[in-house]
């Protein structure tokens, strides 16, 4: 997830100014809309009434990746607002469920160590994303469309691979659905 999200975030301000002629007002609205799904992440508990956590997490990753891949195809104010909200829904729901699953599946004694390693992997993914942007745009000549498609496509492929590789883990804690 850090790879896909980091590409989206790193390219966003330049993309919206160059392709959609955003001013500070539109960028401010875009960033505000990006946070709306974060405020609504509590609604995950309602989704969990009908969808298992693992599937919900993978579905959220898929939604985020598709939102990133669609970004360059809607270089208008409302198009970018829409793709940003789609991407952000996936991002915030995944972050919410990811913490829950980690705490369920990892032994309590190993949790701090595991979460530290996970943060290190996220940071490495972000650094890989930033260096890839520079390399591919500066040296290979990729444009915004290619970069967003590549990042979103990689996210989709990784998510589908995870879906196949890990069909279903048993739930570590029984979730009460009352």
Language-model features: locations:
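Hydrophobic core of transmembrane alpha-helices in multi-pass small-molecule transporters
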Residues: 67, 78-94
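C-terminal ends and interior cores of transmembrane alpha-helices
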Residues: 62-75
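Transmembrane alpha-helix termini and helix-breaking/packing motifs in multi-pass membrane transporters
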Residues: 18-19, 42-50, 127-148
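Glycine-rich segments within core transmembrane alpha-helices of 12-TM secondary carriers
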Residues: 113-131
